[in-house]
Amino acid sequence: GDVYKRQVLLDDHQNDVAERTRQLAENLGLAPEFSEALELAAKYHDEGKRDLRFQQMLGADPDAEALAKSGHRSVAEAYRARSRSALPRGWRHEQLSALMVAASPEKMGEHRDLVLRIIGCSHGHGRFSFDHDAGFLLKEGYQPEGTDYEALKEQATRLFNVGYWDNLMEQTSR
């Protein structure tokens, strides 16, 4: 992965990725509906990093804007930060990113399932299903600021416990 010498703000990072994605889609001459889905997915692909445990792991100031990248740290520093963060082993921010966008219909545009699939399969961890259910993904009191824990838990149960995510993956594979 990339080495960042300085902290990178989450909103700046996602906006930069969305803009690069838009330019690339335009240069490739992709169909507008596909370009829109890619750009929306890029804009929200790291929303799960707003989880307060993830921010703690990155060393973010709880009163400052959310971080996407922590800046340069040694392997030992990164390991200690992960251990102190209360994130369970195997927790993936892209799963929470997909959940947060699913819980915010205004972020998905017309191609909801495609946007969610791209987000959930980002970072080279594309998977047909996630190993973790709603109880593993969320922890009350650590949800991103401005989100409703109960609403997120309800949506997470639908997506990851009941099986909507698996259906979504199957439908968008065709």
What are these model-derived regions, one by one?
Residues 7-23, 37, 43-44:
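Phosphate-binding active sites in nucleotide-utilizing proteins
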